[in-house]
Curated annotation (Swiss-Prot):
The record marks 28-29 as: Reactive bond for trypsin. CDD domains: Kunitz_PPTI-like (cd22608). GO terms for cellular component: extracellular region. Pfam families: Kunitz_BPTI. This is Kunitz-type serine protease inhibitor bitisilin-3. One of its GO terms (molecular function) is serine-type endopeptidase inhibitor activity. The lineage of its organism: Eukaryota, Metazoa, Chordata, Craniata, Vertebrata. Glycans are attached at residue 29. It is found in: Secreted. Expressed by the venom gland.
Amino acid sequence: PLRPGTEKHTFPFPAEFCNLPADLGPCKNYTGRFYYDSASNKCEVFIYGGCPGNANNFKTREECRKTCVEICILPAELGPCDEYTGRFYYDSASNKCEVFIYGGCQGNANNFKTRDECRKTCVEICILPAELGPCDEYTGRLLLRLGIKQM
């Protein structure tokens, strides 16, 4: 149930919509907007037609940056509702995706349905542990080991 004065999100969490491509939309009232480019991890300018499009659309670079770029440093946030469910958030202190209890509405963007989604969004590839994988072919690979100054 919703607590008085709260409302459910009617759009996906930023972690989901920040990965959508820039969308001009069908209208022709062209204006400059910003979208989050997940490939470059930056907020970029795009031309918006003025209607529909998608939720990866911000009036200012700052709004885009606060919504999409910095989500991984936000704390876990329960939110004001009472529909408790397990979710994952990125804990920047431990550099891991951890479980937390989410109330079902509001909260913040550091909120992922799966650990894998959290890792893809927040964990830097160079701090992931080496994984051998399920196959039995032996192929040489390089591994970056942080804190070791050897070549």
